Regions:
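Active-site-proximal structural scaffolding
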Residues: 21-24, 50, 81-84, 107, ...
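Structural signature of eukaryotic scaffold interfaces centered on beta-propeller domains
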Residues: 1-5, 55-62, 113-119, 128, ...
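Surface-exposed loop and turn segments in beta-propeller and other repeat-based domains
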Residues: 42-50, 101-107, 155-183, 243-256
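Short, conserved, GDST-rich strand-edge loop motifs in beta-rich repeat architectures
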Residues: 6-24, 70-82, 127-142, 205-227, ...
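Beta-propeller blade signature
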Residues: 23-36, 81-96, 138-154, 219-241
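Karyopherin-beta/Importin-beta family HEAT-repeat alpha-solenoid scaffold
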Residues: 40, 57, 80-89, 97-100, ...
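Solenoidal tandem-repeat scaffolds enriched in leucines and small polar residues
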Residues: 1-97, 115-125
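Loop/turn-rich, solvent-exposed surfaces of beta-rich toroidal or solenoidal domains
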Residues: 69, 143, 188-224, 228-232, ...
Length: 281
C-alpha cells in the first residue's frame, strides 16, 4: 500500500547451553524509499517455535508493523477444530507492542491472511471452523472478514458460510475412500485489494491427498500423491459483504502441487499466474 516504506524481518536463535534455554529473537527493520533505516525493534519469543509460528508481517503507511502469528491453544477442543489460535501484533516505531487475539463467535479461525490498505486499515480474512460439528465434507465451514483501524481496534466483523452446492461439488469430484481428510483443505495464497472497484478478494488453493498401493518384491508400500486441483476466489466489498465466489479448476500434477502463484487485480479483473508443469514422457 505504501512504496515509501520497506520492511525487513529476520529471526535469530539465541541458545544458552549453560541454562539450557532457547529463545527466538524476531528482528524488525523499517527503511524509507532510499533504504535509510528509520527504526529497529527486537521481539523475544520465549515460548519457542513449537508454540508460536509467525505467519505473515506487513507495514502500514504510518510505519507500523503488523505481525500475524499462530499459537498453540491450551483449550481442549473437538478433533475437527484447529488446535491453534490466531493473533496479530501491532508494533509501532516507538517500540510499543499490542497483541490482538482473533475471535469469531461460536467458531475458530483455521486459516488467515492480513492485508493493509492505503489508509492504514488492517483487513484479516480467512476460513473458520464452527465449534458445533456440522455434517459436511469440509472442515472449513465458511469465510470470516475482519477490519481493524490503524489503532488496531476492531471496526467490523462478518462471517459467511459456504453454500451447500459448494460442498456437493467438491464431494462429487473426489473419491472419498482414497482421500486423506487430514491433508485436505484450503490454503490461502493472499489478498488482493482493488481500490478502483472498492473490492477485496481472498485467493486460495484447495488441496487434497490421494494414496496408492504398490507391490515391490512382495513388500507392499503406500505412496502419497498431492494435488492442487482448484483455485477459490471470494470477493467482498469494503464493508465485508460477499459479492461473489468462484471455483476454478487448476490443471496440475504432483510436481506443481506447491508451486507459487502470482496474482493481481485491475479494472475489476483478477489475474492469476502459476506454474502448471506438464508430465514428461
Amino acid at each position: 500500500p505504501d512504496s515509501t516504506k520497506v520492511l525487513f524481518t529476520n529471526v535469530t536463535s539465541n541458545k544458552d547451553h549453560r541454562k539450557q534455554k532457547y529463545k527466538d529473537e524476531y528482528v524488525i527493520n523499517v527503511f524509507n524509499d532510499k533504504l535509510e533505516k528509520l527504526w529497529e525493534k527486537k521481539i523475544d519469543f520465549s515460548v519457542a517455535d513449537k508454540d508460536m509460528i509467525i505467519s505473515q508481517s506487513q507495514i502500514s503507511s504510518d510505519g507500523d508493523v503488523f505481525i500475524l502469528v499462530k499459537e498453540k491453544s491450551k483449550e481442549k477442543r473437538s478433533k475437527w477444530c484447529p488446535s491453534f489460535d490466531y493473533s496479530f501484533l501491532k508494533v509501532t516505531s516507538n517500540g510499543d507492542i499490542e497483541k490482538i487475539k482473533i475471535k469469531i463467535e461460536n467458531a475458530y479461525p483455521k486459516h488467515a491472511k492480513l492485508s493493509i490498505d492505503q489508509d492504514g486499515n488492517c483487513y484479516l480474512l480467512g476460513y473458520f471452523t464452527e465449534k458445533k460439528k456440522r455434517d459436511v465434507f469440509r472442515f472449513e465451514h465458511g469465510i470470516f472478514f475482519h477490519k481493524y483501524d490503524s489503532n488496531g481496534d476492531l471496526v467490523l466483523q462478518k462471517k459467511h458460510k459456504w453454500e451447500k452446492e459448494f460442498y456437493v461439488k467438491l464431494k462429487e469430484e473426489y473419491n472419498l475412500d482414497k482421500v486423506s481428510s487430514g491433508a485436505d483443505g484450503f490454503y490461502i495464497d493472499g489478498i488482493s485489494i482493488d481500490y478502483l472497484q472498492n473490492s477485496i478478494s481472498l485467493i486460495s488453493t484447495h488441496r487434497y491427498q490421494t494414496f496408492g498401493n504398490s507391490n515391490n518384491g512382495g513388500k507392499g508400500t503406500t505412496s502419497r500423491y498431492n494435488y492442487a486441483n482448484h483455485i477459490i476466489i471470494s470477493s467482498f466489498d469494503f464493508d465485508g459483504n460477499l459479492s461473489w465466489t468462484s471455483c476454478l479448476e487448476k490443471k496440475s500434477n504432483p510436481m506443481s502441487f506447491l508451486s507459487n502463484m502470482i496474482f493481481g487485480c485491475y479494472n475489476d479483473n483478477i489475474y492469476l499466474i502459476f506454474n502448471a508443469l506438464k508430465k514428461l514422457g
